[in-house]
Regions:
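Residues forming anionic-ligand binding surfaces in small-molecule and nucleic-acid pockets
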Residues: 12-35, 55-78
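Accessory "access/gating" subregions that flank catalytic or transport cores
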Residues: 45-48, 53-59, 75-80, 91, ...
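Active-site neighborhood of thiol-dependent amide/isopeptide-bond enzymes
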Residues: 77-89, 112-113
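Single conserved hydrophobic/aromatic residue that forms the stacking wall/gate
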Residues: 1-11, 301-312
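Acidic, His- and aromatic-enriched active-site or binding-groove loops in soluble protein domains
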Residues: 24-43, 84-89, 133
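Beta-rich nucleic-acid/ligand-interaction surfaces
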Residues: 68-74, 109-122, 167-178
Length: 312
């Protein structure tokens, strides 16, 4: 997998009080793709994009998202390492520019109850020579593309701990448009993974479960390993799930495996995972799991946990 796209980063902005501390009051109450004057973030998004361009990071698009004070900036494709670097820089730029404008930017997955959470949509494209493996052939995906998707679906439950690292992450799953089930579709936007059949050189797949609490280097590396695992083991891609998750029959949903629904469950999956044990150094995996267990204990005494806030 050689190229990853600017990750569909979603963030929320909150106003500060007179003591320069962030409040729970959103900067605006605009909706998806709203415009000024309802969308009060247009100038700030422009400032962020221009700052990124000065740092040789070129946004592809920006807009107001569904939630109050929620915004999204997408990047152009780059190689996986560069995409991870860009995300780290992007988060710092967003927080700095927001602070300069008297606002507090949070990447917390579920900062406002009963409103859309903020995810990190990771878009993957794979080049084989000069050809895009995910570009449709005769109206469908190539066998290699299908096996890569199958590899991700097979291993995504095990790697969820690395894609969603805080207790707050799991409050987003299954809420409103956020994924809960391990499923895929060509066009249904509610599924965990979407594989469009767009006849373009930049067609790729989109994983919708990750959030901005993840270490992007771990996330990218594990997703690449999952794709390779699918190809090597010739994993078979299950049938697409084209039903609306919210109105699907319970018998149909019962056939689907779910993502871990809590940090504790994600830790348990990771501890038992042969996939992670084979791909990560033993000391690194053990240390990461130990840190996450400490976070679970911390939650018993405070909510949200310090880790939730520090990664937001």
């Amino acid at each position: 997998v050689e190229r990853s796209r600017g990750l569909g980063d979603v963030y929320k902005r909150q106003e500060k009080d007179d003591t320069d501390m962030p409040t729970k009051r959103p900067h605006d109450y605009a909706g998806y793709c709203d415009a000024a004057p309802v969308d009060r973030g247009e100038n700030l998004r422009r400032d962020i994009c221009l700052t990124l361009e000065q740092m040789d990071i070129f946004p592809e698009s920006s807009r107001h998202e569904t939630g109050p004070g929620q915004n999204e900036i997408d990047f152009q494709y780059s190689n996986a390492l560069k995409a991870a670097d860009n995300l780290v820089t992007f988060k710092n730029v967003v927080k700095s520019v927001a602070d300069r404008n008297g606002l507090y930017a949070t990447f917390m997955p579920k900062p406002i109850v009963d409103n859309c959470g903020s995810g990190l949509h990771i878009m993957l494209m794979c080049m084989k020579g000069t050809e895009n493996v995910f570009r449709p052939q005769l109206g469908g995906l190539s066998k290699e593309a299908e096996r890569m998707i199958a590899g991700i679906l097979k291993n995504v439950g095990d790697m969820t701990l690395f894609l969603n690292t805080t207790t707050n992450s799991y409050k987003r799953f299954g809420s409103l448009l956020a994924p809960k089930y391990i499923s895929w579709s060509h066009e249904n936007y509610a599924q965990l993974l979407r594989a469009p059949l767009a006849d373009t050189d930049e067609n790729g797949i989109i994983l919708r479960s990750a959030d901005n609490t993840c270490n992007p280097y771990f996330a990218m590396g594990l997703l690449i390993y999952a794709c390779i695992d699918g190809v090597i083991n010739k994993e078979e891609l299950p049938k697409p799930f084209n039903f609306n998750i919210g109105s699907a029959d319970e018998n149909e949903l019962a056939k689907l495996e779910t993502l871990p629904q809590s940090l504790k469950e994600a830790v348990e999956r990771a501890e038992k995972s042969e996939f992670l044990a084979d791909r990560l150094p033993e000391h690194m995996l053990e240390r990461f799991i130990a840190i996450e267990k400490e976070l679970i204990i911390c939650l018993l005494y405070t909510s949200p946990s310090p880790r939730d806030l520090s990664t937001s």
